[in-house]
UniProtKB/Swiss-Prot annotation:
This is Protein GrpE. HAMAP family: GrpE (MF_01151). One of its GO terms (molecular function) is adenyl-nucleotide exchange factor activity. It comes from Myxococcus xanthus (strain DK1622). Keywords: Chaperone, Cytoplasm, Stress response. Residues 16-33, 218-245 have a biased composition (Low complexity).
């Protein structure tokens, strides 16, 4: 076929060319239109499923959060109840302690009093015996026994006396009220004990009042008698007037 034949076989006018091409153009768009709705439906379904999954996850998290809040509320409620109970227990303990303190202040010396009452009974018996019998020896023995029972009663409560006579003076446990010169006791030692000291459970409750020894003062030496003039001193005194005479002779010779 020649070129002239090809050109003759093609469309002669633009309208014919458009008419010949129109069937192909009208058939292609419907295929695209048919595919679009199915893709949209699939995308919508996928989005719905995603939203449902997110909703279920959010609901699950919400239920979990609510459960945690409920548990936290229960724990807070229990903690508050415990705090209220502890506060009540503390208040009750404070009241009991205050009551016990008041009882100790009022009746703390009850045991000591029970131990001292027999001492008073012994003193009453000693006074009655002295009134009935003037025997001083028996009275002295009774007083000594009463004193011993009194000291034993104090000892049961931790009270203990101590002797200071002959000891080195210690200002921590001794109170000096006087000093005395004596050679019988070393200086700085206790010569006499006026009042005994006492301990209460190793604590000093009263120092011992004592008189402290001091070394006797040395005697003052006797005054020496005045010195007597010696004879040699007298001779010197007699020779003293001779000097002026000699001076007179010497003065005459010079004349």
């Amino acid at each position: 076929m020649t070129v002239i034949e090809v050109e003759a076989s093609g469309p002669s006018t633009p309208v014919e060319a458009e008419a010949s091409a129109s069937p192909a153009d009208t058939t292609s768009p419907p295929s695209d239109a048919e595919a679009t709705p199915s893709e949209d439906v699939a995308a919508l379904r996928q989005e719905v499923e995603s939203l449902k999954a997110q909703l279920e996850f959010s609901q699950a998290k919400g239920r979990e959060t609510m459960e945690r809040l409920r548990e936290a509320h229960e724990r807070a409620k229990e903690a508050q109840e415990r705090t209220v109970r502890h506060a009540a227990d503390l208040e009750n303990y404070r009241k009991r302690a205050q009551k016990e303190k008041e009882e100790v202040q009022r009746f703390g010396s009850e045991k000591l009093l029970k131990d001292l009452l027999p001492v008073m009974d012994n003193l009453d018996r000693a006074i009655d015996a002295a009134a009935k019998s003037p025997d001083l020896d028996s009275f002295e023995k009774g007083v000594a026994m009463t004193r011993k029972s009194f000291e034993d009663a104090l000892g049961r409560h931790g009270v203990k006396g101590f002797s200071a006579k002959g000891q080195v003076f210690d200002p921590r446990v001794h109170e000096a009220i006087q000093q005395v010169e004596t050679a019988d006791v070393p200086a700085g030692h206790v010569a006499y004990e006026v009042v005994r000291g006492f301990y209460l459970n190793e604590r000093l409750v009263r120092p011992a009042m004592v008189v402290v020894a001091r070394a006797p003062a040395e005697p003052v030496a006797a005054a020496e008698p005045p010195a007597v003039a010696e004879p040699a001193t007298a001779t010197t005194d007699t020779e003293a007037p001779a000097a002026p005479a000699q001076s007179e002779n010497s003065s005459g010779g010079s004349q």
